[in-house]
Amino acid sequence: MELSIVTPQGAKGTVAVSEVAFGKEFNQDLVHQAVVAYMAGSRQGTKAQKNRAAVSGGGKKPWRQKGTGRARAGTIRSPIWRSGGVTFAAQPRDFEQKLNKKMYRAALRCILSELARQERLVVVEEFDLDAPKTKILVQKLAEYDLTDALIVSEQVSENLYLAARNLHKVDVRDVQAIDPVSLIRFEKVVMTVSAVKKLEEVLA
């Protein structure tokens, strides 16, 4: 199959790509699983609370077991006491979900294929800036009628990276750093020809 190479003036030529990487049927369940697994793996999981054992103090029994008329108590750090520990306190945990490499790559193929079908994949000859200026990047994106885009390059230049940092609807990634969430998050995905070829090698 072939993808059109786009210029500010319109389509200019095509680039041949593999059906394996850009012509797969969309598998919604697989893509959903990949997205959920990626987002779960991105969680910090550092939330922590103190249970009755972790709260400082409470080593001494506050009063004797019998004879006071009060309810029996073994520690002042019981969860039912003020300043006591938390019942079922949250602990740090790893939310990572296992996803086989084959499934992950297959999900990327599905997403890229669907982007191509929906004409959300914009292939350009090259995408770089002469200076690290956000204004220049905005003007360049406007030439392609883009405001919300992920820019994928084989190797991201420092100028492009610095220029895109201040745009919350624009992100820049090299081929090795793309993921399912970033691909579906943006309205358009701008990809250089060299990035397409590199991605084809990885996913074929």
From Swiss-Prot:
Can you list the GO cellular component terms from the UniProt entry?
Answer: ribonucleoprotein complex; ribosome
Where in this protein does the record put region Disordered? 47-69
GO annotation terms (biological process): translation
**What Pfam families does the annotation carry?**
Ribosomal_L4
A single Gene Ontology MF term assigned here is: rRNA binding
Keywords of this entry: Ribonucleoprotein, Ribosomal protein, RNA-binding, rRNA-binding
Subunit note: Part of the 50S ribosomal subunit.
What does this protein's UniProt record list under function?
Answer: One of the primary rRNA binding proteins, this protein initially binds near the 5'-end of the 23S rRNA. It is important during the early stages of 50S assembly. It makes multiple contacts with different domains of the 23S rRNA in the assembled 50S subunit and ribosome. Forms part of the polypeptide exit tunnel.
As for family, the record states: Belongs to the universal ribosomal protein uL4 family.
Task: Report the protein name in the record.
Answer: Large ribosomal subunit protein uL4
Q: Which organism is it from?
A: Teredinibacter turnerae (strain ATCC 39867 / T7901)
High-level lineage: Bacteria, Pseudomonadati, Pseudomonadota, Gammaproteobacteria, Cellvibrionales
UniProt lists the gene as: rplD
